[in-house]
């Protein structure tokens, strides 16, 4: 199935019907762009996180992990500029009172314009000059001036609400790493270069979230802050671009569905020396940002050092120098890359059986390391349940295993195909034999491959090693 034939509705319907993702708080009418990961979705998303941690922490000789608090000292966000300037440009339609993001209105009507490089005043002037930019709700060109809308969720700590109790839900996980730089370097005794990786929730009060789990107000980030000596940063910037792209390719994303887009100088954040986005060809847009890799220089550590009065310098024993490290940041949204894996894996195959009857097989070609279940155990008859459950219980010590003894074996195969289970293990009467008839058990099972639908017979004792070999990437 070509990428252009897929639609977001196909992905959403499969996720809702098979327990990957449900609308949040659905029995109360839901909450806009709030999604809950169901029984399959939580296993799938956990596997995405495990795959990232495996390559970025476990196998990397440079990186260590961290799990920082969601609610931080509010001075953190004053220092970084989030309190004063982490804002979206909002305007209202005077005719129908609908509220919109100005940059989105401009970008949708004039994709040739680099909106990221425009100031709020420049956006105001551009919209005023272009009457083809109209309200998507009522079609009128009559807007209020742009105003700032801060994206941080504000909360309060303690029993009273006043300015001294104000805190924020973190809009990014990166700052938890920066404020812990000295602690991590001291306790791990790491020398530069080294990185700190974190998986965690972040919150942004987006005015126009959408496209399923692509953009939500509550989301999970997988970020690495890689600290290096100034002057070596561009070399490491190139290293991490390749490393990130190879991780995606190793887990089944096709190279032709990825592109690396370097930010133009006008797009760059004022503290950034270079930024590249790895973009994916999502079915609902031409290209969508998947992964941002940025050279943040020493901006963050310098700001925190100045504001806190605590030294965040690194002493280089080889050169006898003190300096503030530069930072390369590969920042990936877990929910967004999970959606990309689902879009990539989704397929509808048109099949014809031996009688000439046509059928459509819906299948998720997920990499085995990402699939919610690594395998499913299917007894050919419920009479074989004891042996089948014995196999299931043994394999479940090592990975997630599904068990299904309801319906024809063909229908059970199709159910497992649709949820992405890479291997189905069929227990039949030859497996257990028949002592009364003098037929010895062969202690073998049939293993069916999801993608090829081919079947092989193998001893039960070889199942664990066989499946584990397929999970590697």
Regions found by a protein language model. Give the residues of each.
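NTP/phosphate- and nucleic-acid-binding module
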Residues: 1-473
């Amino acid at each position: 199935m070509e990428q252009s034939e897929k639609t977001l509705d196909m992905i959403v319907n499969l996720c809702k019907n098979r327990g990957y993702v449900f609308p949040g708080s659905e029995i109360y009418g839901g909450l806009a762009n709030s999604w809950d990961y169901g029984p399959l979705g939580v296993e799938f998303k956990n596997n995405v996180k495990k795959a990232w941690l495996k390559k970025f922490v476990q196998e990397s000789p440079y990186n260590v992990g961290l799990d920082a608090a969601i609610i931080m000292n509010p001075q953190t966000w004053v220092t970084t500029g989030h309190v004063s300037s982490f804002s979206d440009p909002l305007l209202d339609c005077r005719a129908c009172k609908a509220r919109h993001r100005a940059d989105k209105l401009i970008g949708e009507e004039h994709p040739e314009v680099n909106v990221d490089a425009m100031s709020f005043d420049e956006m105001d002037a551009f919209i005023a000059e272009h009457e083809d930019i109209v309200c998507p709700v009522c079609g009128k060109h009559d807007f209020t001036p742009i105003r700032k809308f801060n994206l941080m969720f504000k909360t309060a700590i303690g029993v009273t609400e006043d300015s001294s109790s104000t805190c924020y839900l973190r809009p990014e996980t990166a700052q938890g790493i920066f404020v812990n730089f000295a602690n991590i370097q001291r306790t791990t005794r790491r020398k530069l270069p080294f990185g700190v990786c974190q998986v965690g929730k972040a919150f942004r009060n987006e005015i126009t979230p959408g496209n399923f789990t692509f953009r939500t107000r509550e989301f999970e980030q997988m970020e690495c802050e890689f600290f290096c000596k100034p002057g070596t940063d561009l070399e490491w910037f190139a290293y991490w671009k390749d490393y990130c792209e190879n991780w995606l390719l190793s887990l089944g994303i096709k190279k032709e569905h990825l592109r690396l887009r370097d930010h133009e100088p006008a797009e760059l954040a004022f503290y950034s020396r270079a930024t590249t986005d790895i973009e994916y060809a999502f079915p609902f847009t031409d290209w969508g940002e998947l992964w941002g890799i940025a050279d943040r220089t020493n901006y963050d550590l310098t700001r925190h050092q100045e504001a806190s009065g605590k030294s965040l310098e690194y002493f280089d024993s080889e050169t006898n120098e003190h300096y503030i490290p530069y930072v390369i940041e590969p920042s990936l949204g877990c929910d967004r890359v999970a959606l990309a894996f689902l879009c990539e894996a989704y397929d509808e195959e048109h099949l014809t059986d031996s009688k000439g009857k046509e059928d459509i097989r819906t299948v998720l070609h997920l990499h085995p390391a990402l699939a919610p279940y690594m395998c499913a155990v299917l007894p050919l008859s419920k009479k074989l349940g004891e042996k089948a459950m014995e196999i299931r219980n043994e394999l479940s010590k090592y990975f997630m295993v599904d068990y299904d003894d309801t319906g024809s074996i063909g229908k059970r195969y199709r159910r497992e195909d649709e949820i992405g289970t890479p291997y189905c293990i069929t227990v039949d009467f030859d497996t257990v034999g028949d002592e009364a008839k003098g037929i010895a058990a062969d202690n073998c099972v049939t293993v069916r491959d999801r993608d090829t639908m081919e079947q092989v017979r193998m001893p039960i004792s070889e199942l664990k090693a066989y499946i584990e070999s397929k999970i590697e990437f």
